[in-house]
Amino acid sequence: MTARLGARGAVELIRAHDGIVHRCLADFAGREVKHTGDGMMAVFPDSKRGVDCAIRIQREFHHYNQHAQEPIHIRIGLDSGEPIEDSNDLFGTTVQLAARLCAEAEKDQILVSETVAREHGDTFAENLV
């Protein structure tokens, strides 16, 4: 991205991304755990808020991309469970599965674990972008 857009262009794109995601996190009581350079890990008080936030993020980027010179494509992976918190970071199978789902997602796609699908599958069916 930096090679294509230059340092300034890449920073502007990251700021646009982070602005959208941070607004959505705030709306659903989400908390950024860490920025991974090309994405971020977040945690929510409950899985419903995580699902609703993911859908809002997807919609916000869809809207952003309709008017953007440089579109931003996102991938989201969701799992539900109790991660282990240590040194301001999260660990455990929930975190690992969410990361794997994110890595497997196509651009602009939300992939969820079986647990999330079982608990909130209807929410996704009702909110297709």
Place the predicted regions along the sequence by residue.
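Residues that scaffold the ATP/ADP-binding catalytic core of kinase and kinase-like folds
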Residues: 1, 43, 86, 119-120
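Catalytic NTP-binding/metal-coordinating core of nucleotidyl cyclase/transferase enzymes
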Residues: 1-53, 60
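Helix-adjacent hinge/juxtasegments
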Residues: 49, 58-68, 72-74
